Amino acid sequence: MSNSEKQTLAIEWFKNMSEIKKSRENGLVSKVIAKDVHVLSGAKKYGILWKGKEGEMIDHIAKGQNEHLYEMIDFNSPARLFFDMDFKSKDEFGFGCDIPPNQVVVMFMEELQLFVNKLIGHDSGKFNAKEVLITQCKRLDRPDKHSFHLVYPKIVFRNITQMRAFVLSFGHYLFEEKHMMSLAFQKKGKNRSLGRAVFDMSPYTRDRLFRLMGQSKMGEPYENTLRPVKIQEVYETSNNFFDNLIDDNGISSHAQIITLRYSELENISDYMVQPCSFLDMDATPPSTTLGDLIHNSVLKNYGNVPLKTYVAAKQDRRGVTITLLGNNNKTPGNLKSAKDNILPVDWHTLIKEEFRGKEINIENDEQFLEFFTARELKEADYVYYYLNFISDICHFIPDKTMLTWMNGCDDYVSTRSERKLFYAKESSSKKPITGRFALSLLENVYGVDNVNDLRNPVPKPIGDFKNVKRTVMTTEEWEPIEARDLRSRILTEQNKDLKTNNYINGAITMDFEKEEEYAKIGVPEDEEGNRIEMAQRFNSKKRAYFISGQMGASKSSGTLESIVELVMKGMMKNVLIITPRIVLAKQTILKLFTVYKELLGDSKVKRDFKKTNDIDITAMFHKAYQDKEIRQVKEWCRGRINPEMEHCNICVSLINSIHRLNRAVYDTIIFDEPITCIDNFYIELHTKNSNENAAEVVANTISRRNAIVNRLTGFTMLSNQLFFIDAAFTPDSINLCKSLYYGEYSFIVSPREWNKHMRSEGVGDTTVKNTCKRINKENLEIRKRIRIVKTRSEDKSQMIQKEEVTYKIFREPQMICVYDKSLEKPIFQKIIDYKSKNKLLNTLLETICEGQKVVVYCSTQKESERLYHAVKGWTERKMSWIPRLILITGSTVKKEPGEVVNKIKDGDVIFTTSVLGVGTSISEEGLFDCAFMICKLSVGSPLLSDMIQLSARVRATKNRVLHMNISCGQFGVDCSKLTRELHSFQPANYMYGGFMDCLDITHRNRRLFHHVCISNYTIARETMLSEITDALGHVKDATLSRISPEYIYVKDVDHRFLATRDITEQRQLAQKLDVLDCRMEHTEEFVDFVGLYKNKKEGRRVVAKINVPKKNELLHEFWQKSKIGREGYTPVTHKAYSLKRSHSTMVEHDMDDDESTNKKQELEEEDEECIDIDEYNNERF
């Protein structure tokens, strides 16, 4: 057995971390080991070290076996203090550390000893810096790079959070307090103001990897492994070892690094940061006495100090001068996103015993004072929280009450508290004061689940928010624009409003001179309801477009074309496009790229544009650049950009990937298919076992949604323009999008109207006053933009800084309906709704046998997979030629996003779900012969934004017919209570609140509606059919009149048509409805012959279908008179159908012309091979 095979005996490997994370969530904590599997990408696989097998892995290391292993440091488990030292020697250009590596290690240990002595004082004897285990990685290919790992086995912290606090405070002590610049160096790079310490201060986060001793990175030589070493003088000196190592210049000249052998080590497991015993709940927990002592001292001394993980360096002739990031007024460009790392707070010290573990209800702001004492906040060194707490609630509590609370813990005179309160009100006058900070502080101390906010600070939307009724577009609200005029319309509006190169802090500004324009747009008011002074009316404009209309009318294309042109002109700088699907994101990128290249090659553009900006088209979603075409777009755009010149950016992102955008600011944001984006927030709520772990599923989904919404709102508030493009707007979804545009609270209603409305409902005066005050504060803060203006004094002797306060003006959103006169007919002229799913499947099988190109849409992936396997097995057994079946699932889209459309074009039968989503355009007209759609009502229905638009993206099948079946997924649900609750939601006159609140109510009402629909099949069917019919219709002209497809409901067929033996009459009925539907009721009356024949002249397949009575003696005459018999096609295979109810019978015959004319076809039951549709539904579905 090989060495690698022996290694697997102790470690159980997994492909990714998802399964390991699941075991952690279930409470199983094991030692996780990682291993390099790819040289270039650095990819790793992860495994769990079996309990009791740590010794086996240690033996492998002791034998010198290099498996490229890392230990994963569990974030919430005890861990030994460790340092990762990584630095370079100083080169000829002055970059790097100019001290020998052995002396760097000694100086680091000395400063660490002094820092710990400062923290724990008289207990400093408990820590000895020489009790350290060191490993070194010598790189033969890069001898100037030095890497050391230091582990202190006797210092154990309870978790990584405590260790992170200690290490960052140590960095603050070195570079801020002592200015120990010898332990930092300048890095190479474009930004020469950046530097770093000799030890890494950033790896103390969740699930970090630490390379094990004796291991190297994959692809590196064996000599690059981490080997144990010792500093000779450090280990051999007994008394005052630091004094012996330091010469007159403060640097040791005698320290030597000596490599150790594994045989010289007492215990190799001591070199691990987290041995298995630290993670074993059954083992004795490690002692954290010294770690706790150090941590408590760190909290006391550095609890309110902003700590940094980076240092900034400036190079001069004397050497390297290091300063902490944040001390200078100007932050280095590459570090603007660096976050302050304030030490964690021990909230338990603020808990009052009488409220411990109890439920807390906050009905008014004064109750906050009952749970906190100012003296405790001060004594606990929480002054930061104390001052913000006062500022957050002082506007809603009488001054006398606040002073009583403040003086009750203050030894000074009351005038001191009055002065504090005055400063608190003054400092908070420029901030949105809503009482949120006080509430969050209370939740942190007593727990989120134990605190209920009953103040109702802002009216909440309680309307009937089912989001299932489509918007009726009228000319009064929506402006009709022909598709070819959309681009020119957007360009005209932008040319009128935007001023090129007129950016102020990222905002394009404009001035208003006429009072009438303010009246139309709406001017912000102050707390007393007075309008803002004219001097402050230099406002940045903000605009929103809602673009709806026909499917296929080029709404998105027209918008993207205008956006590219505006960016090239410099009228837009940074643009963000958000889509719900990967396929749509790729098509958007390719469309942008095509338009960009066309404009660059247009001589008219070069003549009309004074200056054209280069555009960087980027993709920001998971595995984006694994796609070859997207990667080519990126390389082409980056090749044109001059790094010394300013360029513009267009970023395409998925709704679930906006966290990758960090803190970027975009002046224009486009939401393509926003309804689907909103629906995706609750995509994980649908689960089979709704009674099991339902609360956990909801909590996880809401948590994920909150993070996305908060990030999304942050982008929209900083942007100047928003575009919402969708063909299926609903009134509720429009309100959701408006909340993204306006902000958390609506600006349409003035505070005085809020006041009047609440008083009419009997709300108390105090509540009305506080509520209006909160709304005013929030509205003003969202609108406000503070700009620092520098001017010279009259004598021009000094510069004067002055704050210029401006407010944004929010214009009314423009509602645009796009129509195309060339699309006169609906996408589907006829919708055939099958009551029985078996009938639909019979039609599908027959269509496949005829050789037609078919697309089948299913509402769930499971349904699509089962149908795919059933049809695949059926065609392999029954057909002489095998059609190419293509299954499009979520994994297909993720693995091969660029090949999805090509697969759709190449396949014969396409099975897919809503995973492709909206926007998946198929350019070929009539690519498919027939379309089928199978919808199963579930919690995710009846909103069919994905399914409807996906079927419509086929544009028009050749026969313009959609075969559809709607079924119910659950039966027997008692929804009487849910029905009453649903009807209890009555529309109110409240304006809609925040985007997050609207989503909550959307989900709650829709879920009730879904359950009602599940129990009442009629309601669901009517709602879904209405949605489908409206969506698949087309706008006829500028009057917005809509042409809807013809609807046919296939139910029991009149038996009088089946009683006759007139073939002509039967064929007329088949054309009116469906052939198989007629035969299903009387199987013994008919035999269906389906033949596949090859045309000798044209070399193509021709399909013929013959329907005759089974007992008709003139079968051979009908065959001779048929088109096949007259034109002399050569039969290949003949298959005879005999259909029963829920049965499809097929018999194969090899025939030639003589047999077809002389032999009478008699089918006996014992010779037939049957397929039971019900049976394969049960077994295969």
Curated annotation (Swiss-Prot):
| GO terms for biological process, alphabetical | DNA replication, synthesis of primer
* Spans traversing the lipid bilayer: none
Q: Name one Pfam family in it.
A: DNA_primase_S
Q: State the source organism's domain of life.
A: Viruses
EC numbers on record? 2.7.7.-
Record keyword Zinc present: no
Which GO molecular function annotations are given, in alphabetical order? DNA-directed RNA polymerase activity
Task: Fetch the InterPro entries from UniProt.
Answer: DNA_primase_S, P-loop_NTPase
Q: Which Gene3D superfamilies match?
A: P-loop containing nucleotide triphosphate hydrolases (3.40.50.300)
Per its UniProt entry, what is the enzyme's top EC class, as one word?
Answer: transferase
Q: Which UniProt keywords apply?
A: DNA replication, Transferase
This molecule's function is given as:
Synthesizes small RNA primers for the Okazaki fragments on both template strands at replication forks during viral DNA synthesis.
Family membership, please give it: Belongs to the eukaryotic-type primase small subunit family.
Give the protein's recorded name.
Putative primase
